[in-house]
Amino acid sequence: MPSGLTMKETVSCGGVVIYRGKILLLFINYRNRYEGWVLPKGSVEPGEDHEETALREVREESGAKGKIIEYLGSCEYEFNAKEDTVHKTVHWYLISAESFFSRPQKEEYFVDSGYYKYHEAYHLLKYENERGILEKAYNRYQTLKKDGRWT
């Protein structure tokens, strides 16, 4: 870690949201500094458990409502922000959406959203760690659907 920077630990939760085999993605454009397609996720608020955070963030960022099917795992990464090096852990959940409805949260710099076929979503995603979670989630979805357990 470069001198002068402090380490800040953060925890976020998010969802791979699926409806009728298609995956929800959001397009973020943060002041033209970075942009790309991402999965919905966000920070844990006081008093929330990880499942509550994942469902709230999906609803806030995309307008989509759904239910958690299962925990997918976590990923960790670091980035620099102002005077800190941020170490972020993201817990991911497989979520079944109620419909194809989505409305990007403009206040958080999301400018588009939609449901995409797996291969489209995989290639659209900006971050490699999110592509890995998407692959795991879609494999579980296919297994659950084949076994008649996808709801």
Task: For the regions a language model picked out, list residue spans one by one.
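Charged, low-complexity, helix/coiled-coil-prone segments
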Residues: 1-6, 36-38, 70-71, 75-84, ...
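Unchanged
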Residues: 44-132
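A generic structural signal for ordered secondary structure
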Residues: 14, 19-23, 50-51, 71, ...
